[in-house]
């Protein structure tokens, strides 16, 4: 199946208010998707929060961009469910790691981050095989 990016973008704008707003906020991602550059759009979405010191803001920006690219990719028929779930799992893992690092840094600014363990279900567990 060949991905129909323009039709997917049109459907997203017409029928999904969240995606329509995300497309307005991230026109560079919309342009990449319109050109069928799905891997470049995914890479840009993953990097959206890089360099932002505020962890919450960085995670919100990445989440918005990743949700946009994955949803339009799904509508276009470009991303199988396993790929979407793997990307969501990867983001959940990065978000949990960043949040824990920020909390430890805030509570113990002079202590090195020694890591943590988590038992997770839901999006975290989607990577199971």
Provide a role label for each language-model segment.
Residues 1-129:
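Non-catalytic regulatory/linker segments of enzymes
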């Amino acid at each position: 199946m060949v991905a129909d990016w323009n039709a997917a973008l049109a459907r997203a704008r017409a029928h999904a208010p969240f995606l329509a707003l995300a497309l307005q906020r991230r026109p560079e991602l919309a342009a990449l998707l319109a050109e069928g550059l799905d891997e470049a759009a995914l890479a840009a979405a993953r990097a959206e929060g890089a360099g932002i010191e505020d962890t919450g803001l960085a995670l919100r920006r990445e989440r918005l961009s990743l949700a946009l690219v994955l949803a339009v990719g799904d509508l276009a028929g470009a991303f199988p469910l396993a790929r979407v779930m793997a990307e969501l799992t990867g983001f959940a893992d990065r978000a949990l790691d960043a949040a824990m690092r920020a909390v430890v840094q805030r509570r113990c600014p002079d202590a090195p981050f020694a890591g943590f363990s988590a038992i997770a279900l839901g999006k975290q567990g989607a990577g199971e095989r």
